[in-house]
Swiss-Prot record:
It is found in: Cell membrane. InterPro entries: DUF1656. Its main location: membrane. The lineage of its organism: Bacteria, Pseudomonadati, Pseudomonadota, Gammaproteobacteria, Enterobacterales. It comes from the Bacteria. The gene is aaeX. Disulfide bonds: none annotated. It holds the Pfam family DUF1656. Keywords: Cell membrane, Membrane, Transmembrane, Transmembrane helix. This is Protein AaeX.
Length: 67
């Protein structure tokens, strides 16, 4: 992550990881919308914890691929 510069927008500086977080968000929403009707959430013990882990995995994937 150290190769990309810090972006400054309207006087606010954003690290490159911020844009990876934003890129992972639509992927998370899409994947969650696909998984909910499949019945997978009925078998999951803690759906909020699963969602957090899913978003973390998607963030890692996006940051690994694009940063």
């Amino acid at each position: 992550m150290g190769t990309l510069p810090v972006m400054v927008l309207f006087g606010l500086s954003f690290p490159p990881a911020f844009f990876a977080l934003l890129a992972a968000l639509p992927l998370f929403w899409l994947l969650r919308r696909l998984l909910q009707p499949s019945g997978l959430y009925d078998m999951i013990w803690h759906p909020a914890l699963f969602n957090c882990a899913l978003y973390g995995c998607l963030f890692y994937l996006v940051s690994w691929l694009f940063i």
